[in-house]
Curated annotation (Swiss-Prot):
Residues where Zn(2+) binds: C69, C71, C87, C90
InterPro entries, sorted: DNA-dir_RpoC_beta_prime, RNA_pol_asu, RNA_pol_N, RNA_pol_Rpb1_1, RNA_pol_Rpb1_3_sf, RNA_pol_Rpb1_clamp_domain, RNApol_RpoC1
Cofactor comment text: Binds 1 Mg(2+) ion per subunit. Binds 1 Zn(2+) ion per subunit.
Cofactors named for this entry: Mg(2+); Zn(2+)
GO CC annotations on file: chloroplast; DNA-directed RNA polymerase complex; mitochondrion
GO MF entries: DNA binding; DNA-directed RNA polymerase activity; magnesium ion binding; zinc ion binding
Pfam families, sorted: RNA_pol_Rpb1_1, RNA_pol_Rpb1_2
Name of the protein in question: DNA-directed RNA polymerase subunit beta'
C-alpha cells in the first residue's frame, strides 16, 4: 500500500516475475504458500462466501470483515509490527479488511504471453528492439508461423532439410511423418520457436549496449551514403535512419532504468485487489460485477484448458496446443486492452467489456478522475464574468455558491449568536434565507480568502487567492486584469473556487497567493496584469469617429433647412448644428467638447500647421469638390482634408477632418514621444 507520507512519487514500468510473486505470496503456519489464483470462481452460490483459490479468495486477498476469518471466528487484530496471525483451519490472516484494497494475487500462465501495450501500441517497443516488422511479430505471437531456434554445435533435424527431395512448402507435411506425437513435441520444443516464447528468447538474447552500438554504426553508414537518383530509395533510407534513432533511444532508456526487455513477455499475470473490481448487489438482490472479473475468468478458463494437455496428456496434437496458446494470448490481450486488435469483446447485452486500459486511461480513468482530478469538499464551480468595479484582489461570489461553501461557518455563527439552538434549526434558517444569515455570511467572508483555479493549471498563477464579496446572479465576477494569469477569457470559461480551511493554507493564501501580489510573470519577470484588452477597446472607442463620409453633412446652399440652422459665432471657431465646425487649434476643439457643444465622435475641421504636414501625396490627389469665394480664394475639398489656396495658387492653410477622440489620441502620443526624447 502506498503511504502518502513516505512516498513522494509514482512510476509505472515493467516488473519482474519475482516482484509479482513478492506482492502476492504469503506463507501460512503450516508451510503452505498462497497467492496464486487457480480457479475462475468468485462466490459460492449457496453460502455467498468467496471460493477458495478463486478471484475473491480470503486466504489470498484477506478477510472481507476485519478480524473475522472464513470460518466465522473473530480474532483480535494484532499490531502490524507483530507476526501475522492466521486461522489454523481456513488459513485466513487476522488483519483489517482494508487489506483487500491493495493485496494482490497472480495467475501462473501455462505459456509466455506478450504484453499487448508493448507489441501493438505505436511505436511497438518489441518490434524496435527485435528489428523485425510488426506483422511478422504478430504472426509469431499468435502462432500463425514459427522459425528455427539457433542451436549452435548441435545436430538438428532442420539442418538436414537439404537431404530431402521435398519442396519447402511440403516440408511442414513431411516432418511429422518421421515422428510419433510424443517425439514431435520434443522436436518442437527443441528446434522450433513460436508464440510469445520466441519473442522472449529474442529479447533476452542480445545486450542492450550491443544494440545501441550496432544501430549507431548503421546510422553513420547510412549518413555517409550518397543520395540515390531514385526518390523511393532516399525515402527508404530516411525511414531507416529514423527507426535506428528510436531504437537507440529505447535501448538507452532501458539501460538507465535498469529494465530487462524480456519483461515485456509475461509469465505471471498480476490480479488486482478485489476492492478495485468489486461485486455489489443492486435492488432486488441481483449481483453486479466489474468487467475485469469476467475478463480474469476468461483468462483462467483458457489457461487451465492449456495446463491439462501439457501436464497430463502426452498424445495431444501440436496444432491443438498452439491453438490453445493463441486463445490464452487473446484472453490476456482483452484483459489488458479490449479492442486493440480489432473487434472488441462484448457481453450478452452487446456492451463492450471495460478492460484494464479503459479503467485507467481517459478523462474518466483512474488517474485523471480519481487521483489527479478529485472533487474536494468546500469547492464550487461557475462561469466567470467581468467585474470592472472590483478591486484587483477581490472577486464576486454568487450567493448560492457562497452559502454552500461557508455553510459550516454560518451555522457556527448562528449558534454563537443564539439565533439557533442546534445544527438542524440553523440549517432550516439557511434554507429559508433569513436576513440574519446574509449578515453572518458577510462577516465570515470578510476574514476568509478563497482560491480560484482555472484548468488546466499550467503554472502557479493558475491558482490565485481573492477576497470574496457577495454578488447577485450565478456567475463569478472577476477583475479583467487578472485574466492573463489564468489564461482565461470571458466567453463562457469556468473556474473552480476553493475554501482554504487550515491556518497554514489561509496564511499561504494571504501572504503569497493574493492576486495583487502576483503582478509579474514567474517565467520571464514581465508584468502579467496589464490592461491589454482594455487598452484596445478604449482606443477603438476613442477613434471610431463618424464613418458616414464627408458627403453626408456637407453644406448645400440649395437646401432650405440650412437657413434654419442656429449659428454660433466665436473668435476661435465657427460652429453650426448641422454643418461640421471649424477649429483653429486642438485646444479649442477640446474646450468645445468639455462645454458639450460637440460630441466625442462628431466630425470637425481642424486647422493644421503647414510645417506639420503629414498628409501624403497632397498635391497629386484629385479633389472631390472645389469651392470658390468672391475674392478669388478657393477650397479644394478632399475626403479627409481641405486645402485653402490663394489667387496665385499658393497654399494658405490646411484643414483636416477629424474628431475629438482622434485629437485626444494624437496628443497622448505626442506627449509620450516628447517625454521619451527628453529621457534619452
Amino acid at each position: 500500500m502506498i503511504d502518502r507520507y513516505k512516498h513522494q512519487q509514482l512510476r509505472i514500468g515493467l516488473v519482474s516475475p519475482q516482484q509479482i510473486t513478492a506482492w502476492a505470496n504469503k506463507i501460512l503456519p503450516n508451510g503452505e504458500m498462497v497467492g496464486e489464483v487457480t480457479k475462475p470462481y468468485t462466490f459460492h452460490y449457496k453460502s455467498n462466501k468467496p471460493e477458495k483459490d478463486g478471484l475473491f479468495c480470503e486466504r489470498i486477498f484477506g478477510p472481507i470483515k476485519s478480524g473475522i476469518c472464513a470460518c466465522g471466528n473473530y480474532r483480535v487484530i494484532g499490531d502490524e509490527k507483530e507476526d501475522p496471525k492466521f486461522c489454523e483451519q481456513c488459513g485466513v490472516e487476522s488483519v483489517d479488511s482494508r487489506i483487500r484494497r491493495y493485496q494482490m494475487g497472480y495467475i501462473k500462465l501455462a505459456c509466455p504471453v506478450t504484453h499487448v501495450w508493448y507489441l501493438k501500441r505505436l511505436p511497438s517497443y518489441i518490434a524496435n528492439l527485435s528489428d523485425r516488422p510488426l506483422k511478422e511479430l504478430e504472426g509469431l505471437v499468435y502462432c500463425d508461423f514459427s522459425f528455427a531456434r539457433p542451436i549452435a554445435k548441435k545436430p538438428t533435424f532442420l539442418r538436414l532439410r537439404g537431404s530431402f527431395e521435398y519442396e519447402i512448402q511440403s516440408r511442414k507435411y513431411s516432418i511429422p511423418l518421421f515422428f510419433t506425437t510424443q517425439c514431435f513435441n520434443l522436436f518442437r520444443n527443441r528446434e522450433i520457436s513460436t508464440g510469445a516464447g520466441a519473442i522472449r528468447e529474442q529479447l533476452a538474447d542480445p545486450d542492450l549496449r550491443i544494440i545501441t552500438d550496432r544501430s549507431l554504426v548503421e546510422w553513420k553508414e547510412l549518413g555517409e551514403e550518397r543520395s540515390a537518383e531514385n526518390e523511393w530509395e532516399d525515402k527508404k533510407i530516411v525511414r531507416r535512419k529514423d527507426f535506428l534513432v528510436r531504437r537507440m533511444e529505447l535501448a538507452k532508456h532501458l539501460l538507465r532504468t535498469n529494465v530487462e526487455p524480456e519483461r515485456m513477455v509475461l509469465c505471471l499475470l498480476p490480479v488486482l485487489p478485489p476492492e478495485l473490481r468489486p461485486i455489489i448487489q443492486i435492488d432486488g438482490g441481483k449481483p453486479m460485477s466489474s468487467d475485469i472479473n469476467e475478463l480474469y475468468r476468461r483468462v483462467i478458463y483458457r489457461n487451465n484448458t492449456l495446463i491439462d494437455p501439457l501436464t497430463t496428456s502426452r498424445s495431444t496434437p501440436g496444432e491443438s496446443v498452439m491453438c490453445q496458446e493463441k486463445l490464452v494470448q487473446e484472453a490476456v490481450d482483452t484483459l489488458l486492452d479490449n479492442g486493440i486488435r480489432g473487434q472488441p469483446m462484448r457481453d450478452g447485452h452487446n456492451k463492450v467489456y471495460k478492460s484494464f486500459s479503459d479503467v485507467i486511461e481517459g478523462k474518466e480513468g483512474r488517474f485523471r478522475e480519481t487521483l489527479l482530478g478529485k472533487r474536494v469538499d468546500y469547492s464550487g464551480r461557475s462561469v466567470i464574468v467581468v467585474g470592472p468595479s472590483l478591486s484587483l484582489h477581490r472577486c464576486g461570489l454568487p450567493r448560492e455558491i457562497a452559502i454552500e461553501l461557508f455553510q459550516t461557518f454560518v451555522i457556527r455563527g448562528l449558534i454563537r449568536q443564539h439565533v439557533a439552538s442546534n445544527i438542524g434549526i440553523a440549517k432550516s434558517k439557511i434554507r429559508e434565507k433569513e436576513p440574519i444569515v446574509w449578515e453572518i455570511l458577510q462577516k465570515v467572508m470578510e476574514g476568509h480568502p478563497v482560491l480560484l483555479n482555472r484548468a488546466p493549471t499550467l503554472h502557479r498563477l493558475g491558482i490565485q487567492a481573492f477576497q470574496p464579496i457577495l454578488v447577485e446572479g450565478r456567475a463569478i465576477c472577476l477583475h479583467p486584469l487578472v485574466r492573463k494569469g489564468f489564461n482565461a477569457d470571458f466567453d463562457g470559461d469556468q473556474m473552480a473556487v476553493h475554501v482554504p480551511l487550515s491556518l497554514e493554507a489561509q496564511a499561504e493564501a494571504r501572504l503569497l497567493m493574493f492576486s495583487h501580489m502576483n503582478l509579474l510573470s514567474p517565467a520571464i519577470g514581465d508584468p502579467i496584469s496589464v490592461p491589454t484588452q482594455d487598452m484596445l477597446i478604449g482606443l477603438y472607442v476613442l477613434t471610431i469617429g463618424n464613418r458616414r463620409g464627408i458627403c453626408t453633412n456637407r453644406y448645400n446652399p440649395c437646401n432650405y433647412r440650412n437657413y434654419q440652422n442656429e449659428i454660433v459665432d466665436d473668435n476661435n471657431y465657427k460652429y453650426t448644428k448641422e454643418k461640421e465646425p471649424y477649429f483653429c487649434s486642438s485646444y479649442d476643439a477640446l474646450g468645445a467638447y468639455r462645454q458639450k457643444r460637440i460630441d466625442l465622435y462628431s466630425p470637425l475641421w481642424l486647422r493644421w500647421r503647414l510645417d506639420q504636414c503629414v498628409i501624403a501625396s497632397i498635391n497629386r490627389e484629385v479633389p472631390i469638390e472645389v469651392q470658390y469665394e468672391s475674392l478669388g480664394i478657393y477650397h479644394e475639398i478632399h475626403e479627409h482634408y481641405r486645402i485653402v489656396k490663394s489667387v496665385k495658387k499658393e497654399i494658405v492653410c490646411i484643414y483636416i477632418r477629424t474628431t475629438v477622440g482622434h485629437i485626444s489620441f494624437y496628443r497622448e502620443i505626442e506627449e509620450a514621444i516628447q517625454g521619451f526624447c527628453r529621457t534619452y
